[in-house]
Regions:
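Proline-enriched interdomain boundary motifs that mark the N-terminal boundary
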Residues: 26-36, 128, 220-226
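Append "Rare intracellular matches occur via the same short Y/T/C beta-strand/loop motifs
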Residues: 85-95
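Bacterial Sec-dependent N-terminal signal peptides
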Residues: 1-44, 96-118, 360-363
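Short, conserved sequence motifs used for protein processing/export or organelle targeting and
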Residues: 160-363
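Solvent-exposed segments in extracellular or luminal domains encompassing
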Residues: 77-86
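Local sequence-structure signature of Cys/Sec-based thiol-disulfide redox active-site neighborhoods
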Residues: 119-156, 160
């Protein structure tokens, strides 16, 4: 059975807004529920455990947890499943309740463990920046931005500093179209949800600016490392991502699933696009990172230096809609954000294959 990627973190509030880094509006609530996992095996034994807090006080014992669709109470604070599907759980404590449920996905295969850590005591990680390109096949000025990116990436050292994701959210007729996140204007580029660039007429100058910005972002030590372990069955991809902290902090985790070799005729007002511009790489097919009003990732909570936290993500691979001929054209970017003022910025990212584990990348 196939599933949509509907894996929301604790007390998620879905708001009609398409920011990436966003701000912290709507993220805090007096009564909140959380879970120790978001994906379980549908064997009737694997269980997810829920907890509840009111203004920071543990009220789990006094909270009743329900399946939202049927308002059936759970047996205590645990949920098991003997059928494949997505289960939505809410909590009620006195007059307090959670408006948005926690989604738990039950799958008919074993949930993958985290990738093996080759150096458990090491916290010195390779640092890469997350470069998000907002373009579309119907955007006539977008080849200028793509040209700047290509020029910047001609330098192998610069290319290795970044993980690139192409967000085709401009026009619905785009074969790689995704409805969100969106940009305020197109073309647009963002690095780590912190530094942004809009269109100008000088791709070579823009390439120089991009190279400088990427170098500055990765010049500081990485606050976290990221590993991933994917498995797949019947076009359902399940990925467990683990985060290890190099610095104490509260972190969020997201995964954007990407596809290469997507063909789409590119509009070009600049007269610079040859046939290669009709083949699009790193196209975002699913941005599983929405929390509150942003796409800054699902909260992992506080992680102390040397400790880890994890989350599992599920993707329904739609070969027909995506015109996907080769599964090797799929990969994913796993990224971590941390709060910076009212915004959330990416503090590290890795590009992962769907066919093998990605261990922590140490310096």
């Amino acid at each position: 059975m196939k599933f949509a990627s509907l894996l929301l973190a604790s007390a998620v509030m879905l708001i009609s807004c398409d920011k990436t880094g966003g701000d912290d509006t709507g993220l805090d609530a007096g009564f909140q529920i959380s879970s120790n996992k978001n994906v379980i095996q549908s064997n009737g034994a694997d269980a997810v455990t829920f907890t509840a807090e009111l203004d920071g006080k543990d009220v789990t014992a006094e909270t009743t947890f329900y399946l939202k669709d049927s308002m059936t109470p759970l047996d205590g604070n645990k949920l098991t499943a003997d059928k494949v599907g997505v289960y939505h759980v809410i909590g009620m404590y006195g007059t307090f309740y959670t408006e948005e449920p926690i989604a738990v996905t039950a799958i008919d295969m074993e949930v993958p463990a985290p990738a093996e850590d080759p150096a458990a005591s090491n916290t010195s990680f390779v640092h890469r920046a997350f470069l998000n390109q907002y373009t579309g096949t119907g955007c006539g000025y977008c080849p200028g931005m793509v040209s700047a990116l290509r020029a910047a990436f001609e330098d192998e050292e610069t290319k290795n500093m970044a993980v690139h994701a192409a967000v085709h959210s401009y026009n619905a007729g785009d074969p790689a179209y995704i409805g969100a996140p969106k940009a305020s204007g197109y073309p647009y580029m963002e690095i780590d949800m912190a530094v942004s660039f809009s269109y100008d007429l000088d791709p070579d100058a823009k390439a120089g600016v991009l190279k400088k910005a990427l170098s500055e972002r990765v010049s500081v030590p990485a606050k976290v490392g990221i590993s991933a372990n994917p498995i797949s069955k019947d076009d359902v991809l399940v990925v467990t991502v683990e985060v290890k902290a190099a610095e104490d902090g509260e972190y969020n985790l997201g995964v954007w699933f990407l596809q290469d070799n997507v063909y789409g005729q590119q509009t070009d007002y600049l007269g610079i696009a040859d046939n290669s511009y009709n083949y699009h790489e790193n196209c975002v097919r699913s941005a599983d990172s929405r929390f509150g009003s942003s796409f800054a990732g699902h909260p992992l909570g506080q992680i102390k230096k040397g400790e880890t936290a994890q989350r599992t993500f599920v993707l329904n691979i739609d070969r027909e809609a995506w015109k996907l001929k080769d599964l090797n054209d799929l990969h994913f970017a796993a990224f971590v954000t941390a709060k910076n003022g009212r915004n959330y910025n990416v503090v590290n990212v890795v590009d992962c294959k769907i066919s093998e584990p990605t261990p922590y990348q140490y310096k």
